[in-house]
Structures are given as structure tokens and as C-alpha cells.
Amino acid sequence: MKTYNIVIASDHSGYELKSEIINYLEQKSLKIYDCGTNNTQTVDYPDYAKKVVDIIIEKSAPIGILISDTGIGMSIAANRSSEIRAALCNNILTAENAKAHNDANILILGAKTIDQKIVFDIIDKFLTTQFEGGRHSTRLSKIK
């Protein structure tokens, strides 16, 4: 089974941002698996959320990124699995807390709602923040 650093997908409204993110992450020498979509033709976001979720569950990648117009539908779809902790983040603080307190394994971004000037900062914070454990582990065990 091939492994990657990050698995990524988007629906049609997140395609352009996804392409920019892939370029950014590849410049950091990260191995990225792109699950699509590969253009701006209308698709159903749950199909792409499931692809990322399945890859994380089978341990082919530890982290996922999902992008849609607001990220809300992607969040709902991804969080259907008890092994997934997907967090819709729109600033650096939410990205940091998603990892530090909630051990999030999928970052969700809203292409139409996020400040494009800080999107890479949000991604960097999500990728570099470590889970704090402790009381946060106790809390997470209550929702598994």
C-alpha cells in the first residue's frame, strides 16, 4: 500500500483553490494524493469526502484536506465516520485548536468563505500543530 503525507479532494467550487494548495504543498516536498475533482464541472461533494475518508481510514495518509464552497457539506460528510475528526477552519486559531485540542485529521476549507491571503498560513498551522492529549484525550474518548 502506497503512503502519502496528505490526501486532498474538492468539489467543483473548490477545484481552483485545491490546485493552488497542491502546488504549495509539493513545493514543501510533501507527497500528495489528489482524489479529484479535476475540473470545474459540477460534482457531488459527498463522493469526494468519502474518497479522502477511506484513504485516511486505511492508513494510506494521516492527514486530509477537503475543499468546497463553504466547507459545511464536506464537514458533515467527512464526520460520518467515528475515525475521522474533520474540522472546518477559517482562520489560524481554528486550525491550531482543531489539531491541539481535537486531534483533527482532516482540514476543511471553504473556497468562497476563506481569506485567500491566509489560506497557506492556516494549512501550515494545521500541519505543524501537535495534539496536546491530556484532558483533550478524555473528551475525545467520549465522542468515539
Curated annotation (Swiss-Prot):
GO terms for biological process: carbohydrate metabolic process. It is an enzyme of class 5 (isomerase). It comes from the Bacteria. Signal peptide: none annotated. GO terms for molecular function: intramolecular oxidoreductase activity, interconverting aldoses and ketoses. Keywords: Isomerase. Disulfide bonds: none annotated. InterPro entries: RpiB, RpiB_LacA_LacB, RpiB_LacA_LacB_sf. Transmembrane segments: none annotated. Substrate binds at H12, R135. Pfam families: LacAB_rpiB (PF02502). Its EC number is 5.3.1.-. The active site is at H101 (proton donor). Belongs to the LacAB/RpiB family. PANTHER family: DNA DAMAGE-REPAIR_TOLERATION PROTEIN DRT102, RIBOSE-5-PHOSPHATE ISOMERASE B. NCBIfam families: PRK05571.1, rpiB, rpiB_lacA_lacB. This is Putative sugar phosphate isomerase RC0402.
